Amino acid sequence: MKVGIIGAGFVGATAAFAMAMRGSCSEIVIVDADNAKAKAQASDIEHAVPFSFAMTVRDGDFQDLKGAKVIIISAGVNQKPGETRLQLLERNANIFRDIVPKVVAIESNAVIVVATNPVDILTSLTEQLAGLPEGQVMGSGTTLDTARFRALIGNELGVDPQHVHAYVIGEHGDSEVFAWSSANVAGLSIPSFCKARQVRWNEEIQSQIADNVRKAAYHIIEGKGATYYGIGAVLARISEALIRNHRAVLTVSANIPEFGVALSLPRLVSGKGIDGLIGVQTNDEERAALERSASVLREALSAIS
């Protein structure tokens, strides 16, 4: 199966490298306006292939996306230190207005995965521009935030994060919502698990975890200029779910008519794309926060629609 990646920057290249190391697909095509950069990234990753899984990694143009099962769009300008994801919107929206129609004209059967920030609004824009069937466009959403959330909870509780079931929903950004009320380990709520295991837990710890997740990208950008390893792994995981029909539950972003914008909720991701909305149990406070998050996104989307 072929995966096309549009954008040879940090995120696109790291996603390609993650796929090569994981054996996510049989062919990767990297497309970028800077042809020399796309060629260099593809060559560099191709030289790592003998140490992982057999596959083809090459550069190409839009025509080479024909036949791709998954097309990842990671093209765009980088987030500056101190800049919110929403402030990126106008700079990246014009790039998508150019790219998306070209992608659909060449391969309308591919599932489009948006990775460029602000990902929720650009996912909404991509859905509008593409005109593809429901479920065929998604954003990486809060998949990385959810992984960070589970990792920090697991570290605090002394549990493998893979056995922590907790979700970050809403915007991939400052208004994201932590669904604490449904978070659990082995079917036990976090407070119940901590009581049974005699692990210290209080609102201060809970608030610190949420704050660390929300500010993670800002700290990384401040230290090295960009985030890419985490999101690269996320894009590899999403691609595998699509290519191998994993029917994985992931907090990808997609449009919800009820909210009038794309945002993240747990969804079933299969070979056909988004195969249904799973949703998540929330309390009144979390539901209100989710509605506020949707309002933030709608306001930003209205500025470019």
UniProtKB/Swiss-Prot annotation:
Keyword NAD: yes
Catalytic-site annotation from UniProt: H172 (proton acceptor)
Listed pathway(s): Fermentation; pyruvate fermentation to lactate; (S)-lactate from pyruvate: step 1/1
InterPro entries reported in the protein's UniProt record: L-lactate/malate_DH, L-lactate_DH, L-lactate_DH_AS, Lactate/malate_DH_C, Lactate/malate_DH_N, Lactate_DH/Glyco_Ohase_4_C, NAD(P)-bd_dom_sf
Activity control summary: Allosterically activated by fructose 1,6-bisphosphate (FBP).
Residues found modified as Phosphotyrosine: Y218
Superkingdom to which the source organism belongs: Bacteria
Residue positions binding substrate: Q79, R85, N117, P118, V119, D120, D145, T146, A147, R148, T227
A Gene Ontology term for the protein's cellular component: cytoplasm
Keywords: Allosteric enzyme, Cytoplasm, NAD, Oxidoreductase, Phosphoprotein
GO MF term set: L-lactate dehydrogenase activity
Pfam families: Ldh_1_C, Ldh_1_N
One Gene Ontology biological process: lactate metabolic process
EC annotation from Swiss-Prot or TrEMBL: 1.1.1.27
UniProt catalytic activity: (S)-lactate + NAD(+) = pyruvate + NADH + H(+)
List of residues binding beta-D-fructose 1,6-bisphosphate: R150, H165
Positions annotated to bind NAD(+): V11, D32, K37, G76, V77, A115, T116, N117, S140
Annotated transmembrane regions: none
Role played: Catalyzes the conversion of lactate to pyruvate.
Family from the record: Belongs to the LDH/MDH superfamily. LDH family.
Protein name: L-lactate dehydrogenase
Organism this protein belongs to: Chloroherpeton thalassium (strain ATCC 35110 / GB-78)
Organism lineage string: Bacteria, Pseudomonadati, Chlorobiota, Chlorobiia, Chlorobiales
